[in-house]
């Protein structure tokens, strides 16, 4: 394989970003960590975001966990996605934190979810636990925007979930709500509470919630992409 190096500054175009991502395909996480000079944890139990941080470093990402996209100047969000040996996602994909108050007048068009999913660079990574972290390989990238049907599905779920939040029913929402988008607690510990609207319009304290793409949505997206690649 030719020698590769992390981008020293943010990519100037989507084409440059995709070209760099394609160069990473086939490398293991251990190889990429060694080439970048960063330590590799033994597993991801305490370093769940490590894979994403490693790939952000290689791709010159700038945003970190701020509200704008990882490649804000290009309008592109980076999503690493752990897959099994058949290329299927192993977990749901975090999109963004859900606003539980101050939602009057909010629309799908102006939502964080739509903003984050307008243009996504998907990078599949081997994720089966039987494969040591350092040996897991990076797959071929996909630069994606939702088509009309995908956007319609996302919008319908987002509107249903936001209606429940505004109506004070956030505590009733389960991971089963939504066809392709779900809302569920996002907190490292159950003491981190945030304000929300209660059933009678009062302010309540509840766990922060996050929007996640369900596996059926990302599985279909990846399957279409890789079938096209293999034609």
Curated annotation (Swiss-Prot):
Query: Which InterPro entries does the record associate with it?
Result: DNA_mismatch_repair_MutH (IPR004230), DNA_rep_MutH/RE_typeII_Sau3AI (IPR011337), DNA_rep_MutH/T2_RE_sf (IPR037057), Restrct_endonuc-II-like (IPR011335)
SMART domains to which the protein is assigned, alphabetical:
MutH
Instruction: Output the Gene Ontology cellular-component terms.
Output: cytoplasm
Q: Which SUPFAM superfamilies match?
A: Restriction endonuclease-like
Q: Does the keyword Transferase apply?
A: no
Homology family: Belongs to the MutH family.
Which protein are we looking at?
DNA mismatch repair protein MutH
Provenance organism? Klebsiella pneumoniae (strain 342)
| Name of the encoding gene | mutH
């Amino acid at each position: 394989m030719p020698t590769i190096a992390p981008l020293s500054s943010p990519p100037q175009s989507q084409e440059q970003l995709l070209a760099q991502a394609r160069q990473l395909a086939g490398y293991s996480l251990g190889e990429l960590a060694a080439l970048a000079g960063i330590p590799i944890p033994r597993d991801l139990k305490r370093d769940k975001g490590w894979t994403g941080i490693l790939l952000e470093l290689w791709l010159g990402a700038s945003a970190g966990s701020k509200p704008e996209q990882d490649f804000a100047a290009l309008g592109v969000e980076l999503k690493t996605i752990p897959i099994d040996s058949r290329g299927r996602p192993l977990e749901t994909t975090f999109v963004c934190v859900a606003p539980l108050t101050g939602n009057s007048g909010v629309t799908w068009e102006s939502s964080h979810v739509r903003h984050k999913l307008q243009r996504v660079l998907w990078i599949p990574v081997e994720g089966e636990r039987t494969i040591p972290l350092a040996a897991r390989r990076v797959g071929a990238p996909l630069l994606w925007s939702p088509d009309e049907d995908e956007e319609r599905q996302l919008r319908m779920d987002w509107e249903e979930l936001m209606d429940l939040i505004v109506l004070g029913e956030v505590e009733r929402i389960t991971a089963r709500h939504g066809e392709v988008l779900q809302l569920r607690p996002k907190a490292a510990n159950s003491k981190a509470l945030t304000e929300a609207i209660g059933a009678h319009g009062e302010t309540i304290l509840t766990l922060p919630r996050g929007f996640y793409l369900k596996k059926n949505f990302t599985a279909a997206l990846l399957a279409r992409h890789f079938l096209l690649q293999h034609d």
